[in-house]
């Protein structure tokens, strides 16, 4: 039997041993503060959708995400709207608006209207990819980047002239945009303005006598009195003139002509038609704004009257510094550099033993939708072939398709050959 004194001695020895062990562990395992940890960024894996290499996220809206991408055939920089069918079904008129936008954009070609380059569809994942020409920034993003929320007069004038050019083209094609606002005006690196988002636009019937419309889904702050007051019918073109007037008011003053705590109060104020123009706008701009924001649509300026106005025709001096394109909100990159470069590096480092990248290997094809009054591509080429020699067209870096559907095979042979050629092409691009 052990005596208490011997048990105490053994206990003290055990405690001493554990203490020595803990000191040893501290010496063996180097303890560092969490702030000293350097986290290795996750390697970006390349993903190809058809012939397009995906880049980083550019933005996200109610309809889906917008990402940058690179055309592996032409090496043109593109933007893509990624639309999920499940999400579109939850949005009122979501699928119908997207289909309408595709139908309209397919027949439009103008410097100041966004161009649709391609439409891809993944049947298994129920995804649609709308490939558009790339724009570096949105006008609303530029306005939000400065404290007073407006452009210098000369800069606003340049953008407004381009807006009128694009709007005149849309109207000449019988299209009412219905949602002109800074948030739907995009800009390229050289300052070219592009009218975008034709989801709520309306194509007038080719044989319609006027521009009468009956529905509107535009942004409330940019709607005219006839819509705010709930009229059954209204002039579609004059709605766009009013919205362009509110846009001009906003980009020159940083304010809105009509405001309200809620949509009901806002529409009440718009319906009355009472607004004021800041004195710093000057007499010429004030007169143009009053003409575009005329309560009576019949007296409201037409595009021809806007073009003939002295403020529109005047050459405005560069007195204030220009509002530049702001840095990217995600990466803070002031140059808005190509975001597909890390993915190109991933392709460049590919070896035969490695799994190359994620590849949308399901059925992906270009979709065509018939537009009222539009000649189908097959019929068009059949007609032109009999009267003139065939000629391959190239629209903004994309070749015209003779078929309405282009399927991508899921066989391993196609993947090996096509993907291999893309790797060689993109790797050569990176080395240059």
UniProtKB/Swiss-Prot annotation:
<comment type="subunit">
    <text>Catalytic component of a trimeric complex composed of STK11/LKB1, STRAD (STRADA or STRADB) and CAB39/MO25 (CAB39/MO25alpha or CAB39L/MO25beta).</text>
</comment>
<dbReference type="InterPro" id="IPR008271">
    <property type="entry name" value="Ser/Thr_kinase_AS"/>
</dbReference>
<dbReference type="GO" id="GO:0035556">
    <property type="term" value="P:intracellular signal transduction"/>
</dbReference>
<dbReference type="GO" id="GO:0002039">
    <property type="term" value="F:p53 binding"/>
</dbReference>
<dbReference type="GO" id="GO:0106310">
    <property type="term" value="F:protein serine kinase activity"/>
</dbReference>
<feature type="modified residue" description="Phosphoserine; by PKA">
    <location>
        <position position="427"/>
    </location>
</feature>
<keyword id="KW-0539">Nucleus</keyword>
<dbReference type="GO" id="GO:0005739">
    <property type="term" value="C:mitochondrion"/>
</dbReference>
<feature type="active site" description="Proton acceptor">
    <location>
        <position position="179"/>
    </location>
</feature>
<keyword id="KW-0464">Manganese</keyword>
<dbReference type="GO" id="GO:0001558">
    <property type="term" value="P:regulation of cell growth"/>
</dbReference>
<dbReference type="GO" id="GO:0006974">
    <property type="term" value="P:DNA damage response"/>
</dbReference>
<dbReference type="InterPro" id="IPR039154">
    <property type="entry name" value="LKB1_c"/>
</dbReference>
<dbReference type="GO" id="GO:0010212">
    <property type="term" value="P:response to ionizing radiation"/>
</dbReference>
<feature type="binding site">
    <location>
        <begin position="58"/>
        <end position="66"/>
    </location>
    <ligand>
        <name>ATP</name>
    </ligand>
</feature>
<keyword id="KW-0547">Nucleotide-binding</keyword>
<feature type="compositionally biased region" description="Polar residues">
    <location>
        <begin position="409"/>
        <end position="421"/>
    </location>
</feature>
<keyword id="KW-0067">ATP-binding</keyword>
<keyword id="KW-0963">Cytoplasm</keyword>
<dbReference type="GO" id="GO:0030010">
    <property type="term" value="P:establishment of cell polarity"/>
</dbReference>
<keyword id="KW-0808">Transferase</keyword>
<dbReference type="GO" id="GO:0005829">
    <property type="term" value="C:cytosol"/>
</dbReference>
<comment type="function">
    <text>Tumor suppressor serine/threonine-protein kinase that controls the activity of AMP-activated protein kinase (AMPK) family members, thereby playing a role in various processes such as cell metabolism, cell polarity, apoptosis and DNA damage response. Acts by phosphorylating the T-loop of AMPK family proteins, leading to promote their activity.</text>
</comment>
<feature type="region of interest" description="Disordered">
    <location>
        <begin position="398"/>
        <end position="432"/>
    </location>
</feature>
<dbReference type="GO" id="GO:0072332">
    <property type="term" value="P:intrinsic apoptotic signaling pathway by p53 class mediator"/>
</dbReference>
<feature type="domain" description="Protein kinase">
    <location>
        <begin position="52"/>
        <end position="312"/>
    </location>
</feature>
<dbReference type="GO" id="GO:0042593">
    <property type="term" value="P:glucose homeostasis"/>
</dbReference>
<keyword id="KW-0479">Metal-binding</keyword>
<dbReference type="GO" id="GO:0005737">
    <property type="term" value="C:cytoplasm"/>
</dbReference>
<feature type="modified residue" description="Phosphothreonine; by autocatalysis">
    <location>
        <position position="192"/>
    </location>
</feature>
<keyword id="KW-0053">Apoptosis</keyword>
<protein>
    <recommendedName>
        <fullName>Serine/threonine-protein kinase stk11</fullName>
        <ecNumber>2.7.11.1</ecNumber>
    </recommendedName>
</protein>
<dbReference type="Pfam" id="PF00069">
    <property type="entry name" value="Pkinase"/>
</dbReference>
<dbReference type="InterPro" id="IPR017441">
    <property type="entry name" value="Protein_kinase_ATP_BS"/>
</dbReference>
<keyword id="KW-0723">Serine/threonine-protein kinase</keyword>
<keyword id="KW-0460">Magnesium</keyword>
<dbReference type="InterPro" id="IPR011009">
    <property type="entry name" value="Kinase-like_dom_sf"/>
</dbReference>
<dbReference type="GO" id="GO:0005524">
    <property type="term" value="F:ATP binding"/>
</dbReference>
<keyword id="KW-0418">Kinase</keyword>
<dbReference type="InterPro" id="IPR000719">
    <property type="entry name" value="Prot_kinase_dom"/>
</dbReference>
<keyword id="KW-0043">Tumor suppressor</keyword>
<feature type="binding site">
    <location>
        <position position="81"/>
    </location>
    <ligand>
        <name>ATP</name>
    </ligand>
</feature>
């Amino acid at each position: 039997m052990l005596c208490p004194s011997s048990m105490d001695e053994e206990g003290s020895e055990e405690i001493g041993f554990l203490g020595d062990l803990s000191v040893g562990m501290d010496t063996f395992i180097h303890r560092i503060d969490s702030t000293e940890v350097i986290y290795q960024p996750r390697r970006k894996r390349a993903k190809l959708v058809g012939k397009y290499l995906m880049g980083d996220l550019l933005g996200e809206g109610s309809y889906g995400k917008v990402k940058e991408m690179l055309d592996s055939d032409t090496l043109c920089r593109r933007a893509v709207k990624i639309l999920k069918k499940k999400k579109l079904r939850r949005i009122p008129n979501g699928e119908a608006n997207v289909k309408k936008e595709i139908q309209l954009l397919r027949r439009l070609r103008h410097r100041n209207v966004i161009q649709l380059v391609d439409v891809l569809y993944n049947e298994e994942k129920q995804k649609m990819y709308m490939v558009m020409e790339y724009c570096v920034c949105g006008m609303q993003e530029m306005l939000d980047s400065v404290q007073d929320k407006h452009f210098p007069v000369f800069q606003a004038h340049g953008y407004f002239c381009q807006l009128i050019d694009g709007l005149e083209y849309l109207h000449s094609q019988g299209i009412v945009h219905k949602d002109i606002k800074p948030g739907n005006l995009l800009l390229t690196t050289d300052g070219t303005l592009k009218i975008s988002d034709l989801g709520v636009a309306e194509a007038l019937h080719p044989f319609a006598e006027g521009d009468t419309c009956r529905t509107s889904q535009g942004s409330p702050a940019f709607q005219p009195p006839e819509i705010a007051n709930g009229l059954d019918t209204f002039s579609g073109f004059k709605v766009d003139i009013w919205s362009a007037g509110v846009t001009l008011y906003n980009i020159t003053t940083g304010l809105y002509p009509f405001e309200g705590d809620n949509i009901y109060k806002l529409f009440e104020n718009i319906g009355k038609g009472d607004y004021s123009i800041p004195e710093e706008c000057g007499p010429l701009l004030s007169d143009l704004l009053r003409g575009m924001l005329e309560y009576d649509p019949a007296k409201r300026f037409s595009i021809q009257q806007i073009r003939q106005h002295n403020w529109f025709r005047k050459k405005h001096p560069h007195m204030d510094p220009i509002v530049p394109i702001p840095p990217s909100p995600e990466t803070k990159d002031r140059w808005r550099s190509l975001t597909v470069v890390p993915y190109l590096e991933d392709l460049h480092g590919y070896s035969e033993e490695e799994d190359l990248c994620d590849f949308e290997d399901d059925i992906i094809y270009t979709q065509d939708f018939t537009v009222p009054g539009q000649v189908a591509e097959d019929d068009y080429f059949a007609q032109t072939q009999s009267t003139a020699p065939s000629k391959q067209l190239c629209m903004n870096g994309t070749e015209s398709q003779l078929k309405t559907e282009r399927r991508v095979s899921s066989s391993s042979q196609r993947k090996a050959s096509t993907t291999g050629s893309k790797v060689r092409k993109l790797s050569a691009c990176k080395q240059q």
